[in-house]
Amino acid sequence: MWLRRRGLGVPSASASEGGTSSPAWTEMGSWVRTICGRLKQRLRLDVGREICRQYPLFCFLLLCLSVASLLLNRYLHVLMIFWSFVAGVVTFYCSLGPDSLLPNIFFTIKYKPKQLGLQELFPQGHSCAVCGKVKCKRHRPSLLLENYQPWLDLKVSSKVDASLSEVLELVLENFVYPWYRDVTDDESFVDELRITLRFFASVLVRRIHKVDIPSIITKKLLKAAMKHIEVIVKARQKVKNTEYLQQAALEEYGPELHVALRSRRDELQYLRKLTELLFPYILPPKATDCRSLTLLIREILSGSVLLPSLDFLADPDTVNHLLIIFIDDSPPEKATEPASPLVPFLQKFAEPRNKKPSVLKLELKQIREQQDLLFRFMNFLKQEGAVHVLQFCLTVEEFNDRILRPELSNDEMLSLHEELQKIYKTYCLDESIDKIRFDPFIVEEIQRIAEGPYIDVVKLQTMRCLFEAYEHVLSLLENVFTPMFCHSDEYFRQLLRGAESPTRNSKFNRSTQKRGESFGISRIGSKIKGVFKSTTMEGAVLPNYGVAEGEDDFIEEGIVVMEDDSPVEAVSTPNTPRNLAAWKISIPYVDFFEDPSSERKEKKERIPVFCIDVERNDRRAVGHEPEHWSVYRRYLEFYVLESKLTEFHGTFPDAQLPSKRIIGPKNYEFLKSKREEFQEYLQKLVQHPELSNSQLLADFLSPNGGETQFLDKILPDVNLGKIIKSVPGKLMKEKGQHLEPFIMSFINSCESPKPKPSRPELTILSPTSENNKKLFNDLFKNNANRAENTERKQNQNYFMEVMTVDGVYDYLMYVGRVVFQVPDWLHHLLMGTRILFKNTLEMYTDYYLQCKLEQLFQEHRLVSLITLLRDAIFCENTEPRSLQDKQKGAKQTFEEMMNYIPDLIVKCIGEETKYESIRLLFDGLQQPVLNKQLTYVLLDIVIQELFPELNKVQKEATSMTSWM
């Protein structure tokens, strides 16, 4: 048979070589292969082979147990014990798996993470300022008290408040006052800046209270740190010398390096963009519309606060100091003084320093006294959906006037009771659209009277519920809506229009206004138009900048200033001796004056002026009676007089005008407040011996003495050559002094101003140091020093990628495997105990971090941290730590890190491995640019947690970009 098949096979082979194979033989081969493949799939031989490869010991024991069961079948009842154990192990392994974790076994440790509810700030809050409802749909979001005044119900200890106030005061003293005091001494702008800083700090404190700090640390910040450690480990594998570790790590990051680390200028630009991105959430509503304010705050925060703070945190010396504090097992220092009382957050810091009345700050009483303002205020309340708040005040006032009568009839009590029921249904019921939020006891008292018999309404005469409700609503109007109205479009329309008020008669029958006719804003347009009109002076074209109050398209020819001792008198006959010291000067009142220089007859401007009463008594010796007259001078004419007297006679220390008001209205009220100061100035001038025969001063005090001579003009872009040639012939010096200084100052004033950039941008980071001193230093140099056109990826950053490790237990295993290189048996043991102890360890870690944070936020420690931050930002002139001190601190840090590892772990991994691993971590923390990289990554995570709205904005921007 074998030979036969062998013989049959020969011709088959020869036939195959000839290309004529048997179809039956081919079909049989394919059928056998199919059957074997199906049998292999059913038996899962590949899976069995892989299991044997992964678990050789377990498979060997299972094989031995199977062989023993076959050979020793008489003792099968004994072998069932081992089979039960194997079945239990397999069952638990298949049912639980690595993702199945045992709950926390430490029942005494309980940590409750914070529940993230509604955001108190932007875009919705937990309580409406008017009705108190959650997610109020009737009133605008800007009416939320937490949005407009986030410091409400926010209290801190007085010592912490004082420390924060000190830091903010230093911010103003170092970055605002050095240049602001050169402009004006008015504190109005600084007061607004104080409120803005208080708003910013309050928003941060509220948002920090809302986030779960331990969860952020364990779930996000530590994960970013693990990725940073991985980069350092990979970089260390490429280089052996520590000096090249930082550069190797930066190359390992590649395009995933944080954008702020590309260069120091990119870092500053990133901080600027970050602050601008946060402005809608950290500044008061509508504050971002003010370009100058946002630009100033951006430069202060980015260049003078955040940049030095991040440099301080990334400094290896600072990192070593923080590590020593964290590793130190000594008990924390206890407070030596009792806790200070709680005070409203930064209330003392935000108190206004400006004592002068501001046109942008009105009282509710002022609004109610003027019908035009009250009308504007009601329109504003209608726009805000809160006109019923004012209506409640008016209704309660009328109700109180009626109920406080001594004797009330039954009809009057019945009418009052019906009115009270309307008040209750309109303003107290939850279903009412005009509901106002009151304390519960107020609503209960009003409800009890409203639902009781009508004769009980007289009890309201002695009850405090209605009075407290009125005080609450009045406070709401004064503290919330009135400031909002002063910054609203309605009020600005009122200022631009100029309110006509009742007039009064003066001694010269000139009408005035009660509050001042105009605030000067309505004339800005005409002054800008005047720039493009010109007049000639000695062949030079001069733009006509009308600065005087009330000018409208005013054009005048060049004025020749004459100051000499010639006996020219505007009031009396010539050649009469003049002694200004004998003149009596007073400014009894401020009046209004129609500008005769206006070209448009139909548009006469009424300008507030000082009325100067002059009594001349220096000609009695020649038989003349005392002469009386009045002169009307504008506010700016006084400063022109002072400037010209200074040019001819020098300064007079005992006769000085107050600081000139450049920005802001110079209206009737303002001039009235300056009346006594200007009167004293003139009285002191006429008493100076060298001015006793001054023609300039006499012209100023004479009704016809140079009406346009004292109108201040700004004259840029003039022909200096022609002016210099004409000055000696037109100027006659008084007593021959001060001509040369006058000519020099005149030439300087005529020089053309330098062109201004179209969009000015601050470049000086701090007025106390040069720009490059903070931007470039020896520690950070130029960061990674990468070009702007370096390849960048579209994803957010290197650290937001999904990682397989999650939680403190996984982080410890990761560090042990990557850094400490633990043996396989220990790694498998840790993986086995992960199911039992992962949740327990993470719960204990959260509890431990929460306890540490509570200790850190104790009063004395918080004050100490704020002091350290203050010293890091503002103590620029203090000597830095010496290199020897820094090396000593680094050595101490390394020793503490070596001692921190338990001896049991050292026995498992070995002493040499311990040293190499700790050295790797320590060397990674001594690289300033790498520390800065980690700092910015952690900063981004913290910002996204504090301001989750940024994630929505970014998603919308990303979707919009992808759609386009």
From Swiss-Prot:
Residue ranges with Polar residues bias: 13-23
GO cellular component: cytosol; dendrite; late endosome; late endosome membrane; lysosomal membrane; lysosome; postsynapse; synapse
Keywords: Cell projection, Endosome, Lysosome, Membrane, Phosphoprotein, Protein transport, Transmembrane, Transmembrane helix, Transport
Gene Ontology BP annotations: autophagosome maturation; postsynaptic modulation of chemical synaptic transmission; protein transport
A Gene Ontology molecular function term of the record: phosphatidylinositol-3,5-bisphosphate binding
PANTHER family referenced in this protein's UniProt entry, alphabetically: SORTING NEXIN, SORTING NEXIN-14
UniProt-recorded name of the protein: Sorting nexin-14
Organism of this sequence: Mus musculus
Gene responsible for this protein: Snx14
